[in-house]
Amino acid sequence: MADETFKYVILGGGVAAGYAAREFVKQGLNPGELAIISKEAVAPYERPALSKAYLFPESPARLPGFHVCVGSGGERLLPDWYKEKGIELILSTEIVEADLPAKRLRSAHGKIYNYQTLIIATGSTVIKLSDFGVQGADAKNIFYLREIDDADQLVEAIKAKENGKVVVVGGGYIGLELGAALRINNFDVSMVYPEPWCMPRLFTPEIAAFYEGYYAQKGITIIKGTVAVGFTVDTNGEVKEVKLKDGRVLEADIVVVGVGARPLTSLFKGQIVEEKGGIKTDEFFKTSVPDVYAVGDVATFPLKLYNELRRVEHVDHSRKSAEQAVKAIKASEEGKAIEEYDYLPYFYSRSFDLSWQFYGDNVGDAVLFGDNSPDSATHKFGSYWIKDGKVVGAFLESGSPEENKAIAKVARIQPSVESSDLLLKEGISFASKV
């Protein structure tokens, strides 16, 4: 089995890989210089679709419809595009060893890939209940969602268990989005999470109260303050019941788990400097190892706006960090300088007919504005966060494109504000005037 050698290798085939490939082409790439090595069987695609439109009962999203870079309004990069540009897509290939000093990767089949420059874009893997030793956690019809294969298995179960009972374990992004998707598919949905309210890392209790109330109106049962501690299975090995720590037992035809993710960095342990659970980089996504860059979920990078190191798990950062790394690689080859990465944290979600966006930092005092009652006709409300007399973060539900741009601008500029009363009174119009 002959070695293969490339000038550039992107390890990982997710969102970041696709956006990096596009940036390489934009910057100037010769055929045969770049390879993308991915354990998935398909070309890079927009992962957020899996928890949303992929699960719709009518007109669901399917590949090739959501290959990168459609998620940011760009061109859709089909497998033929990579071929035309002379980019090697090495799919269904798992790398089991990375020798960074030797600039060499080895696949599970023993094949060696050599590189001059490596971009680590390995992303994250889901945290499983079996990681905590939960009894029965390997039963059939317990699902996690990370890759398209996971989504396909869930789609099959949705068809097989039509109108059945679903228990969603977890109250974060995945839990809320999948809870909504399964309710739209006419399942009886219960959500279980240990925290006192949903999305606790971002939402205030007041923001969460709206979504919990709205979900309840849609017929979703929300059970807070407890966790799944075991599962009952039938003779086919399929899950039948979820046992909760508080003693309750829930019937379940399907269980969907969204309890977090961890960055895939184990290949590089002991070879590279790590921090905050990720691979430490500079503002150009260079790591401590020459000619090795890390982007997306795995990178712990300097967040210039707040003068601190952070690791961000979000598609927006995956796209932008990938582009920044490629620009930096090309600039260093040409002896040029580029601007430092200056990222504004951004999160969003869509479920049912709701859609929210958040920009900035959710630290300091939160000021809720608008009507956050689940019964309101408009569902229009938001929140600002004030720290040291400045607005540092902004959240908006059901905003227009102009209003969403306005809250992003506020979070970037961080205007001074004398009192929270002004924000309370003006609401979204405060952001629109900045």
UniProtKB/Swiss-Prot annotation:
Q: Name one Pfam family in it.
A: Pyr_redox_2
**Molecular-function GO term, any one:** monodehydroascorbate reductase (NADH) activity
InterPro entries per the UniProt record, alphabetical? FAD-oxidoreductase/Apoptosis, FAD/NAD-bd_sf, FAD/NAD-binding_dom, FAD/NAD-linked_Rdtase_dimer_sf, MDHAR3-like_C
Q: Which residues does the annotation say bind NAD(+)?
A: 171-177, 195, 201, 260, 313-314, 348
User: Which positions are annotated as binding NADP(+)?
Assistant: 173-177, 201, 260, 313-314, 348
Report which reactions are catalysed by this protein: 2 monodehydro-L-ascorbate radical + NADH + H(+) = 2 L-ascorbate + NAD(+)
Kindly list the positions annotated as binding FAD: 13-16, 40, 47, 52, 95, 146-147, 297, 315, 348
**Origin: domain of life:** Eukaryota
**Can you tell me which residues bind L-ascorbate?**
319, 350
The terms describing its cellular component in GO are: cytoplasm
Cysteine disulfide partners in this protein: none
Q: What is its EC number?
A: 1.6.5.4
Q: Which cofactors, by name?
A: FAD
Tell me which UniProt keywords the record has, alphabetically.
Cytoplasm, FAD, Flavoprotein, NAD, NADP, Oxidoreductase, Redox-active center
Compartments annotated for it: namely: Cytoplasm
UniProt similarity note: Belongs to the FAD-dependent oxidoreductase family.
Q: What does this protein do?
A: Catalyzes the conversion of monodehydroascorbate to ascorbate, oxidizing NADH in the process.
What is this protein called in UniProt? Monodehydroascorbate reductase, seedling isozyme
Q: Provide the organism lineage as a comma list.
A: Eukaryota, Viridiplantae, Streptophyta, Embryophyta, Tracheophyta
